[in-house]
């Protein structure tokens, strides 16, 4: 973005006897970051101009001039030729001044019945609506990658963990589908947030509305808003829709951070469950052997960044009286960075999941080391009539003996198993295999391979 400086004059300078100092100008200017709203600002202005003509406030000639001038400005902005000026403070006054320079008095009439307060609120909602649509597409791409990988590994057994200790056998596909469900809820939250974002604040003016005979519903239709903000004070003063988005974004990043932690662990030699494609890793400047999972590590780190933006927005709003205050200028940078970080993370993640190489033998070996079928033995005893708490105690003693002798439960001979409970029969060995343990959980939401394949089919239908 290029900026220039012009003699001090502005949309409000007539009230003041001296120009704003240079340091205050730099301190208060938002153009270094709100220039990103330019295309949305032009969209809102064109709809506002069309409405002013519709209600008889703006002539057909002025409307045509505004449309032509805005078209030229849009081309300049997209081509990077627009000269942004700190003296014009923000994106709104920069565009208005440039428009007026092109078309004369018609440009000065554009702001009739409008304030920068409702103008910026409209711009942010247009920006965020577009961002949510892109993020929803990114979530869908990530979910698709998860489903594809889960389908390929519906039968691949791995240890399920609690407290990062081997707990029970699950399939890798089942594990991946847990993240599919988390992202599905994230998508629901984003879509629900979009409904509240998609309300038109324009027409609220500074805070009390306007004396011009405006038609807010007309502008809403022009811009694709589902409804109009019903209270002018609320329309310009609150940013709860941005906070809600930031909260939903923080949850998405939290879910991806958890998956990132697992990818990092699984890629480590101590686990060796997976490998990531080289394009998502880096090396060491001193240790030639290193292949570091930088992308998932950065996802973990950037999650803290997004969480921080949520807190910043909450803190920004908590002490403001109605209506608009300059504090709200500080909403844009955390919002923009949250959108950028989340959109980039989703795009990278969808591709990274497609590049995961799974190592089933390592997963199988790991699940054999932690008595993962102990719960199956307890369930077996319960089905034989033993109360669960007694069954739990029996199996715990059997695990201790097996552990001390370096054996698995399935390696204990029947006569030794019967010393712990005489009701154990030789049919128990079918349940103490990994395959038997998985197959036993053949219900909706369970980890049996048949259920995982059915869940994959349902997931594809939801995408």
From Swiss-Prot:
Q: Write one Gene Ontology MF term.
A: argininosuccinate lyase activity
Q: Where found?
A: Cytoplasm
So which domain of life are we looking at? Answer: Bacteria
User: Gene3D superfamilies, from UniProt?
Assistant: Fumarase/aspartase (C-terminal domain), Fumarase/aspartase (Central domain), Fumarase/aspartase (N-terminal domain)
Give EC number(s), comma-separated: 4.3.2.1
**GO cellular component terms listed in the entry, alphabetical order:** cytosol
Record keywords: Amino-acid biosynthesis, Arginine biosynthesis, Cytoplasm, Lyase
Catalytic function, reaction form: 2-(N(omega)-L-arginino)succinate = fumarate + L-arginine
Pathway recorded for this protein: Amino-acid biosynthesis; L-arginine biosynthesis; L-arginine from L-ornithine and carbamoyl phosphate: step 3/3
Q: Which residues form a coiled coil?
A: none
Q: Which InterPro entries match?
A: Arg_succ_lyase_C (IPR029419), Argininosuccinate_lyase (IPR009049), Fumarase/histidase_N (IPR024083), Fumarate_lyase_CS (IPR020557), Fumarate_lyase_fam (IPR000362), Fumarate_lyase_N (IPR022761), L-Aspartase-like (IPR008948)
What's a BP term from Gene Ontology annotated to this protein?
A: L-arginine biosynthetic process
Q: Which PANTHER family match?
A: ARGININOSUCCINATE LYASE
Family, per entry: Belongs to the lyase 1 family. Argininosuccinate lyase subfamily.
**This protein is called what?**
Argininosuccinate lyase
User: Species name for this entry?
Assistant: Thiobacillus denitrificans (strain ATCC 25259 / T1)
Origin organism lineage: Bacteria, Pseudomonadati, Pseudomonadota, Betaproteobacteria, Nitrosomonadales
The encoding gene is argH
């Amino acid at each position: 973005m290029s900026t220039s400086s012009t003699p001090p004059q502005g949309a409000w300078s007539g009230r003041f006897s001296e120009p704003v100092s240079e340091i205050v100008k730099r301190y208060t200017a938002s153009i270094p970051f709100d220039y990103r709203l330019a295309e949305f600002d032009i969209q809102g202005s064109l709809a506002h101009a069309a409405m002013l003509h519709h209600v008889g406030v703006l002539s057909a000639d002025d409307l045509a001039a505004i449309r032509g001038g805005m078209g030229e400005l849009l081309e300049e902005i997209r081509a990077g030729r627009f000269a942004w000026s700190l003296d014009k403070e923000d994106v709104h006054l920069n565009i208005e001044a440039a428009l007026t320079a092109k078309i004369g008095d018609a440009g000065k009439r554009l702001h009739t019945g409008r304030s920068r307060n409702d103008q910026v609120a409209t711009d942010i909602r247009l920006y965020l609506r577009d961002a949510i649509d892109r993020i929803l597409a990114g979530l869908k791409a990530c979910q698709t990658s998860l489903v594809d990988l889960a389908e390929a590994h519906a039968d691949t057994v791995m240890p399920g963990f609690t407290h990062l200790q081997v707990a029970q056998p699950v399939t890798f596909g089942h594990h991946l589908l847990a993240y599919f469900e988390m992202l599905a809820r994230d998508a629901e939250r984003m879509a629900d947030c979009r409904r509240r974002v998609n309300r038109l604040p324009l027409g609220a003016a500074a805070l009390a509305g306007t004396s011009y005979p405006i038609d807010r519903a007309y502008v809403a239709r022009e811009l694709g808003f589902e409804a109009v903000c019903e209270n002018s004070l609320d329309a310009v003063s609150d940013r709860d829709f941005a906070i809600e988005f930031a909260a939903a974004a923080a949850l998405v990043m939290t879910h991806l951070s958890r998956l990132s932690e697992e990818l990092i662990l699984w890629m480590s030699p101590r686990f060796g469950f997976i490998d990531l494609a080289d394009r998502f890793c880096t090396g060491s400047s001193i240790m030639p052997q290193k292949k570091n999972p930088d992308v998932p590590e950065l996802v973990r780190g950037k999650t803290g960044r997004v969480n921080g933006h949520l807190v910043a927005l909450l803190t920004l709003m908590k002490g403001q009286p109605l209506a608009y205050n300059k504090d709200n200028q500080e909403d844009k940078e955390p919002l923009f960075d949250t959108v950028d970080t989340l959109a980039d993370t989703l795009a990278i993640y969808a591709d990274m999941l497609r590049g995961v190489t799974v190592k089933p033998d390592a997963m199988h070996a790991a699940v054999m080391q932690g008595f993962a079928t102990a719960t199956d033995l307890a369930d077996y005893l319960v089905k034989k009539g033993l109360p669960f708490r007694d069954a739990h105690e029996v199996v715990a003693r059997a695990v201790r003996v097996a552990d001390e002798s370096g054996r698995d439960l399935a390696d204990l001979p029947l006569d030794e198993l019967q010393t712990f409970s005489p009701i154990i029969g030789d049919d128990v060995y079918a349940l103490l295999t990994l395959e038997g343990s998985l197959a036993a959980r053949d219900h909706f939401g369970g980890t049996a391979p048949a259920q995982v394949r059915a869940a994959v089919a349902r997931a594809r239908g939801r995408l």
